[in-house]
Design a protein with these regions (language model features):
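Mobile genetic element proteins and their domesticated derivatives, centered on retroelements
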Residues: 28-29, 39, 63, 79, ...
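C-terminal domain-tail junction helix/linker
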Residues: 227-231, 255-332
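Structured, non-catalytic alpha/beta "coupling" segments that mediate domain-domain communication
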Residues: 13-42, 103
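Mobile-element integrase/transposase regions
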Residues: 90, 94-165, 190-194, 198-199, ...
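Residue-centric detector for conserved, function-critical "anchor" positions
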Residues: 1-24, 53
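RNase H-like two-metal-ion nuclease catalytic core shared by retroviral integrases
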Residues: 119-120, 211-213, 219-220, 235-255, ...
Length: 332
C-alpha cells in the first residue's frame, strides 16, 4: 500500500503524544521510511495546514450550496457557472472545485450511452421531407432552427407518458412542450400551437423546424400546420440519429437530472417536468453558451450585453509558474 508521507507523519505525531510511548522520533521515522527533517517540517507547518483545511471546508460549503440549488445534480462546470450567478457572484477556480468535490466525496452521476429505443408507431404516414438542415444546428442564429422530437417517460408507478418538445438549436431554450399519456398526434400539434402562440414574434419565414422521420412529423395534419404557421420543415435521414443529435442529447440529460421515481401519477410527472423546464431555461447554465442559461444567452445575442463579470487569469502568476525551474525538475 502506498501511504502518503503526510499520513505517516500524522501517525508518528500521534504515537509520540501517547503517555505510554517509549519510542523516539528517530526510530519511528526510520521505521516509517521518512526523514526526521520532513517530520519536523510537518510539525512546523501544522498551523498552515489547519488554516487550509478550514478554508477548504468553508469553500466546500459554498460549492455544496451551488450543487444543491433547485435539487438537480451538477458537475464541476455547472457548479462553477452557478457560483458566477450567485448574489454576490463567487469566483472559484474550476480546478479547485474539482479538487474539493473529490476531497469531500461529492459526485455527479455521468450519463452513460444508451441505445435510443423507438416508440411504437400509432398513425398513418405521409410524405418524407428533405433534410434541409443537414446538421447545421447552431450556425443560423437564434430562432432560425428549431428541433422537435418525442420521448417516453416510465418509472413503473405513474402511467407511461410521452413528452413532445421544441427547442432552439442555437440557444438550447425549450420553446414549447407537451406531456401526454397517448401517442395520438394531437399533443404534437399542440406543441407547435404553443410555439406559435408564445414565440410567433421572434420567428420568421426562414425558421426551420427539424425532426426525425417519426409518423407524427410525416402526418398530413402536422405538415399542414407547419406550412400554415409559415415555417419550413426538415427531416433527418432514415435511421440516422446524428441528424437530430442535439435533441437526442437533450432528452438524455433531462432524464438524468429529473428524479421521476417519486411520481405516482400523470400530474406528478407534469409538475416535475414543468419545474425542470423553468429551471433549465433560466438557471441551468451551459458552458458552450458562454456560461449562461438558454434565456440569458438569447438575450445576450439580442442585446450584445454580457450579464456576468468573469475575472481574467492572473498573468503574473502564470508567468511565475512557467519560468519557475522547480516545477520542471524530474527525479532520476
Amino acid at each position: 500500500m502506498n501511504i502518503p508521507a503526510s499520513a505517516k507523519y500524522a501517525i508518528i505525531q500521534r504515537t509520540i503524544e501517547k503517555e505510554d510511548n517509549l519510542l523516539n522520533i528517530s526510530w519511528l521515522c526510520e521505521a516509517a521510511g521518512v526523514s526526521r527533517s520532513g517530520y519536523y517540517h510537518y510539525l512546523k507547518t501544522e498551523n498552515n495546514r489547519a488554516q487550509r483545511e478550514e478554508k477548504d471546508f468553508k469553500d466546500y460549503q459554498i460549492i455544496l450550496e451551488a450543487y444543491n440549488h433547485r435539487g438537480y445534480d451538477k458537475g464541476a462546470r455547472a457548479i462553477y457557472m452557478r457560483l458566477l450567478h450567485m448574489d454576490p457572484p463567487v469566483h472559484m477556480n474550476i480546478k479547485k472545485i474539482r479538487r474539493l468535490m473529490k476531497k469531500y466525496g461529492l459526485f455527479c452521476p455521468i450519463r452513460k450511452a444508451n441505445p435510443y429505443k423507438r416508440m411504437a408507431r400509432a398513425i398513418e404516414t405521409s410524405a418524407v421531407v428533405p433534410n434541409t438542415l443537414n446538421r447545421e444546428f447552431e450556425t443560423r442564429g437564434p430562432r432560425k432552427v428549431l428541433l422537435t422530437d418525442i420521448t417516453y417517460i416510465i418509472n413503473g408507478k405513474a402511467p407511461r407518458c410521452y413528452l413532445s418538445t421544441i427547442i432552439d438549436a442555437c440557444t438550447k431554450e425549450i420553446l414549447a412542450w407537451r406531456l401526454s399519456t397517448s401517442l395520438a398526434e394531437d399533443f404534437v400539434l399542440d406543441t407547435v400551437n404553443d410555439l406559435i402562440q408564445n414565440h410567433k414574434v421572434s420567428l420568421s419565414a426562414e425558421t426551420l423546424i427539424h425532426s426525425d422521420q417519426g409518423v407524427h412529423y410525416k402526418s398530413i395534419r402536422f405538415q399542414e400546420l407547419v406550412r400554415d404557421s409559415e415555417l419550413r420543415q426538415s427531416m433527418s435521414r432514415k435511421a440516422n440519429c446524428w441528424d437530430n443529435a442535439p435533441q437526442e442529447s437533450f432528452f438524455g440529460h433531462m432524464k438524468d437530472e429529473i428524479d421521476f421515481s417519486c411520481c405516482m401519477s400523470y400530474e406528478d410527472m407534469l409538475t416535475k417536468i414543468a419545474d425542470w423546464v423553468e429551471y433549465y431555461n433560466n438557471e441551468r447554465y451551459v458552458w458552450d453558451l458562454k456560461k449562461l442559461s438558454p434565456k440569458e444567452y438569447y438575450q445576450y445575442l439580442q442585446t450584445g450585453e454580457y450579464p456576468l463579470t468573469i475575472p481574467k487569469p492572473n498573468q503574473k502568476r502564470i508567468e511565475e509558474d512557467i519560468f519557475n525551474p522547480k516545477k520542471y525538475q524530474f527525479s532520476n
